[in-house]
Structure formats: structure tokens, C-alpha cells
Amino acid sequence: MSLLTRLCKGNVPLRLNTLKHLSQCGYSSHAKFSEHKPIEKIRNIGISAHIDSGKTTLTERILFYTGRIAEMHEVRGKDNVGATMDSMELERQRGITIQSAATYTLWKDTNINIIDTPGHVDFTVEVERALRVLDGAVLVLCAVGGVQSQTLTVNRQMKRYNVPCLAFINKLDRLGSNPYRVLSQMRSKMNHNAAFIQLPIGVESNCKGIVDLVQEKAIYFEGDHGMDIRLDEIPQDMRAESGERRQELIEHLSNADEKFGELFLEEKPFTEKDIKEALRRTCIQRTFTPVLVGTALKNKGVQPLLDAVLDYLPNPGEVENLAFIEHEGKEPEKVVLNPARDGKDPFMGLAFKLEAGRFGQLTYLRCYQGVLRKGDNIFNARTNKKVRIARLVRLHSNQMEDVNEVFAGDIFALFGVDCASGDTFTTNPKNHLAMESIFVPEPVVSMAIKPNNTKDRDNFSKAIARFTKEDPTFHFHFDNDVKETLVSGMGELHLEIYAQRMEREYGCPVTLGKPKVAFRETLVGPCEFDYLHKKQSGGSGQYARIIGIMEPLPPSQNTLLEFVDETVGTNVPKQFIPGVEKGYREMAERGMLSGHKLSGIRFRLQDGGHHIVDSSELAFMLAAHGAIKEVFQNGSWQILEPIMLVEVTAPEEFQGAVMGHLSKRHGIITGTEGTEGWFTVYAEVPLNDMFGYAGELRSSTQGKGEFTMEYSRYSPCLPEVQEQIVRQYQESQGVGQAEKKKKKN
């Protein structure tokens, strides 16, 4: 019995439009997705933006218009269903996206793989992972908020991975929306060569449709959910502005594209085809950013955005993807991967995300070269472990669909593969190729954590093991001195979300302590060492001598630790060098000034001595311990603290109070701007001074102010702050003040 007959027999009131939508572009079209498509018919895109710019709502509309879902739900809708891509219960409750969700859909016979990413700065590694494996992105901007702090972060990440992007100015229906201001911010703050390819026909409550500057047509979205598109002439009152903006678009394109520039200089008329080809070339080369407009919530502008994804963003064959062959002591050799979907070259894939699913660990991969079929064997390039492919799946948020094979350009997932995020997989282990891994920022906040009930310890350790494996920015360690379990992450929200997930997913309620800043210790200047470790206790003893220098790294590398072997000859036999490095890295875990990790230091081993019988790797490891203690006594040390980029937005009448509070917290104001009764201030503030700021800002701005912050860098802290940290550490260690009069710089 057909679906239609069954529904009618049950006297279910039907809306013919819904059925029409289901039958036309629903299930049948997605059977076509699994057909083997040529590379030109594939797009891998991400949807990224600042928090609350409407990314998830936009993805929901895209899935609806392409027939992937039969009805739409809002992020914070009254029906409590939540958006399709926010599959975690916590995401639906808070109305924010925490994890990247992957899905696929079909538009005009082209496969589109979409990853919806979080906008909150605490989940920035999710964005980092998504952009690493995508060929193009849609950067969503709020027509009211414009370019905000996380927009700048996403922009930097896109630049790092060379991802071409389209800009979509969303929320035209919001009070105070001003897409023209957003465009000028894109040019000034993000240095984008950007211009409108669409204009809004009215904003706020008067938002009627859009003008397409390429086709020179007005587009209106009618019928249920804006599904019927009507093309019309440009309204009379917008013709002058449309002409000016089209000319501006042509000028920007002629500056960015040589071929188009020649046509411009020859003053030949431009066809729609000329403009589209120039837009595609410049967008792929990242020399121009096309700007589209719309309102996802009010169902306007989404279908033209999908057309733009097909027209202007690259297919996997138009993006150069590299793998590297490591050579000891030399620069890695670059190898360009073949994106052809013919399976002639061996399979190469990158694991970009891990997740604990219902059936074991789920590993998300992007196939860059070759073909992978069920039953194939693949090898992990890092561990050389062989894995047999029992099941290949394609993802739609938290649902999955089995497939028999995947080709270059596809995004898919595997079950039961033991690996880390950023691992490379190949069917030919002899080629020694590895793909560049994913950049992972250092955690900046730590909190003590403990289960409320001792009987939950097993579940607690299971949760910690899973979350640390899934998220490389979530760290865990046990502090022996204070006998506390510590978790570290990118911010308070990051750690709170994991605490709530432990209770929700593992039935293990936990208590979080006060946030602690991840300080670091570093040297101020170079310090030489010459240390002899000698121990005789009958039988074979221990003998090791090491000579060298410990020196600070440049400020841009002050979160790193380096070990350099500069020895010549056999005074320190090569088999003992790893022992010295191990000793150095062990000691770097805990500094002697404040108990924090050492960083920004290079350990140069230059010479030493050994004994034919008594020397061992252990002896050289202990010699490294002694050498670092010697450098601690003789060298000058300082404490580094994380500096945050803070952006505060509030009504203009509170500007003085906001600036005063930031200065009181040792903030350095880097810029301000104001518009329509509101101002935004940008500052660099030590993270240690930012705790409790949310409450202070609320009370000083009558609840109207809001702020965002993200990690910027590590920087030396003020002398009085260093003194206080050292004193607190000494008191916690029970060291008398009289005994510790020695002051460190």
C-alpha cells in the first residue's frame, strides 16, 4: 500500500504541498546520492560563523529545500524538537551547537557534503577539524552583529587551510539589521576583497526578497516555507542602487582576475557567463569573496545560496591536497594527491574526528585519493596497524546509512578503528605518506573535578577516557601534591559541558572546582649547565655527564619545548640521547618556581661524558634532572600567563564604565567602534583577571552588555602577579617565608 493511500485511509488531514515536497525531492532523490558521480558533481562545504549567527537554522533550511528532511524545526523552537543537526540533547537544551555534525544532500544532481560547526570559541577545535577536510565554506554573518570575535577566528582558520568561502549575511529580518555595515566590516576587519552579488529588497519587518546582481533580476520566495521562487524585474526604486552595486562588483572582480580585468579595460559588455566564470575563478583562488544576503528563519535567500555553492565553490578536483614523506634531518617532501574518482591510485584518507557511537568508536574520515571498499585492508600511517573495513557509513547528523564504497572527495565514517584525530590511513603502507595533521590549541583553563558518589568511579574513568580521545583540547591529569583530579580545556563552558555530559550520558554527577589558569614557566635568558651524575653502591653504578645550554625560544614559540642534540663524537653515545630528552621532558612537566609546566625553552645538549660499564639510559635521564635543577638555581625565570582577546558590546552610555573595568583588570584596549547607540571595545586581557567578569558586566550595563573572549597567546605576567603566584605555591608546599627569601625574576 502506498504512503498516500495509508495516510488517507487513516483519515489523516494532509497538506498536499507537504506530500508533493516529499514525493518530488524526498527519498527518491537521495537514492541518487549513492550513485557514482563525476568529481564536478561533488561539493564538500562547511557552515561556520560566530555564535548565534544562524548556522544551524540555515543548515536546517538547506536540508528541507533539498528534500533531505520533510519538515523544519527551530533551534529553540516551541515544539522542543530542536534542529536536525543538533542531535545531542544538551545542544537542544542550550540552543547551541557543540559538536560538528556531518550530513549529505543533493541539489540539482550535485552531491553536497555539509558540516555544521559550533560558533562558540570553547569548541574551536571542532571548527578546525571541519575546515581541514573541506574544499569550501559558507561564512555566515549576522546582519546586526556583523564581524564578531569568533568570525575573525574562523577567518584565520580558513586562511590557515586555504579554504575558499562565500559570505552569507543572515538575519535580515532582525531589528537593526544593516548588511552594508557588515560588508564594510568584512573589508576593514577581515581584509576581504568582498562585494555584494545580491541586495536585500527591504530589511527588518519589510524584508520581501533579494535582487540578484549577476542575473539582474529580483527574486521572491512564495508559497509554503518560501519553496516557490518567482523571478521578476528589479523594483523601480532599487534600479539606481542595483546599477551602482553591480558596477562595484565588476570593479572588484577586474582587480582580482586578470582575464576579467582585460575585458573591463577593453570596455566590452559583460555577459552573465563572464561574471559567473570570474566569480568562480577568484573565489577558488581566495582573491575575492562573493557576498549573499537572506534570512534563513523567514525562508528567504537559501536556494540562491545553494546555487552559489554549486557555481562558485570548488569541487574536490580543483583543490590541491598534499601529503608528505618524512626524511630524517630534512624538510618533508611534498606529494600532490590525485583527486580523480577512478581508484587507480592507492587510497589515502584523513581521520578528522572521533566519536563514541552506539556501536563503538566512530571515526570520521575524508577520502583524498583512490577508492575504499567494504572488506579492504587499510593501514594507519602513524602506528602501521592494519585495519579491515567491515562497515562503511555515510552520516546524517546522528543517523547513518551503509555504503559499499567511497571515492576521492567523499566524507564517510568507519566503526571500530583504533586511532587518534589527525591520523592518515592508506591501502599502501610502503609509500610512507602522511597528511598534515590538525592544529590543536593549548588548553588555558583547568578545574578540579570529582564524582559526587564514589561508586561512580568506573563510569567517571570511562567518560574521561572517551572525552579525552574524542577532543584533543580536553586534557586530564592527577595532581599528586594536592591529590586532585584536574581537567583542562578552552574555557569554563567547555569544561561545564563535559561535566553535564558525564551526568547525562554516564549517570555520573560530578563537582567542578574553581577555574584555574594554566600558567607556564620559562627562562629569561640563556643559562649553561655542566652536570655530572655519579652513584656508586657496589656492583655496577651510575655515571653520566652532560654539558649544554638551556635558552628561551622566541615569543611566538613560547608554548613549545625543544630538544636539540648538538653532540659530536662518542662522548655521549647515541643510544643514551633519548634518556637525556626523556629526563628533560619529565622535569618540564613541573617547574620549581610555581609548580606549572615549563615552556618556551630549547635544551641544547653539546657535550658530556660516559663510563664504559656504569653509563645507562637511566643515568643520563637522572643527569638531565640534575642539570635542570642546576639551571633553576642559576638562571633567571619568569611566569607566562594566557592573554585573551576580549570583545565587549554595550549601549554607548556605559562606555566609560566598561573601559574602566577592563583597565582595572590589566586590559590593554586595542580598538573601539560605535554605531547606532551601541559601541564595541576590543581589548587584550590576562585570563587570570577575567574570572567573574560576566556578572560585573551585567550589573554595570543593566544586563544589556555582552562579551566574548578567545585565547590569543602566552605573555610574561606582571612582577606583582608573579610574586603572588610564587608565594601561594610556596605556602601550599609548606615552605617557610624565611627559608625562601631568594627572589626569581
Swiss-Prot record:
Residues given in the record as GTP binding sites: 49-56, 116-120, 170-173
GO molecular function: GTP binding; GTPase activity; translation elongation factor activity
Entries under CDD domains matching the protein: EF-G (cd01886), EFG_III (cd16262), EFG_mtEFG1_IV (cd01434), mtEFG1_C (cd04097), mtEFG1_II_like (cd04091)
Coiled-coil region(s): none
Principal subcellular localisation of the protein: mitochondrion
Biological processes annotated in GO: mitochondrial translational elongation
Pathway named in the protein's UniProt entry: Protein biosynthesis; polypeptide chain elongation
Keyword set includes Nucleotide-binding: yes
Subcellular compartments: Mitochondrion
Domain tr-type G residues, every copy: 40-317
Gene Ontology cellular component annotations, sorted alphabetically: mitochondrion; nucleus
Keywords: Elongation factor, GTP-binding, Mitochondrion, Nucleotide-binding, Protein biosynthesis
Physiological role: Mitochondrial GTPase that catalyzes the GTP-dependent ribosomal translocation step during translation elongation. During this step, the ribosome changes from the pre-translocational (PRE) to the post-translocational (POST) state as the newly formed A-site-bound peptidyl-tRNA and P-site-bound deacylated tRNA move to the P and E sites, respectively. Catalyzes the coordinated movement of the two tRNA molecules, the mRNA and conformational changes in the ribosome.
Family: Belongs to the TRAFAC class translation factor GTPase superfamily. Classic translation factor GTPase family. EF-G/EF-2 subfamily.
Protein name in the entry: Elongation factor G, mitochondrial
